[in-house]
């Protein structure tokens, strides 16, 4: 839950984590008519990943603003010809002159149209085995070459999106 991820960050900073309070907060949110906060994917998935594997620069730049709701994240995993089979990813990232240049497509991307950032799995080593050579990139959603197409359902809602990458260029340290 959002509160447990935030609680973990607090504990790592020297505070005391309280799982009971975290569960009570999550339960009260669930009972209320308040819509869930946007950015849960960033809080629940990105923040723990950065805590374990991120650089100090990434932790400083992204964790606090994500927990405060200042950065909304979407997840770029599923692809049209791969679904959730991440070993079949076809979106490619090539390191050129200190930048990742990304080409490909993601699908079923929740909240992409509202997000400032995407954490995205991209094949960066094309000659590696199917289950290797995949990197986790942090992509600003306002980068030139990104096109977002909402997938409108029969109730006219667009909770999911297709995201296309054409010559999307991000710094090498966004890995």
What are these regions, as identified by a protein language model?
Residues 13-30, 127:
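Glycine-rich loop at the start of a catalytic domain that most often binds anionic cofactors/ligands
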Residues 37-57, 83:
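N-terminal glycine-rich flavin-associated loop
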Residues 91-94:
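A structural signal for short hydrophobic beta-strand segments in well-ordered beta-sheet cores
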Residues 99, 103-149:
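A short core secondary-structure module
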């Amino acid at each position: 839950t959002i509160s447990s991820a935030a609680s973990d960050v607090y504990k790592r900073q020297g505070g005391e984590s309280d799982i009971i309070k975290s569960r009570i907060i999550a339960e009260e949110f669930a009972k209320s008519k308040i819509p869930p906060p946007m950015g849960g994917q960033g809080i629940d998935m990105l923040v723990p990943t950065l805590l374990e594997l991120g650089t100090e620069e990434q932790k400083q730049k992204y964790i606090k603003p994500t927990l405060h709701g200042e950065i909304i994240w979407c997840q770029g995993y599923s692809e049209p010809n791969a679904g959730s089979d991440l070993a079949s990813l076809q979106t490619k990232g090539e390191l050129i002159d200190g930048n990742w240049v990304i080409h490909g497509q993601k699908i079923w991307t929740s909240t992409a149209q509202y997000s400032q950032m995407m954490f995205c799995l991209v094949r960066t080593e094309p000659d590696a085995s199917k289950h290797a050579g995949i990197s986790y990139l942090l992509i600003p959603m306002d980068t030139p070459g990104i096109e977002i197409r909402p997938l409108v359902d029969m109730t006219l809602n667009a909770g999911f999106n297709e995201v296309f990458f054409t010559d999307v260029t991000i710094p090498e340290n966004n890995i």
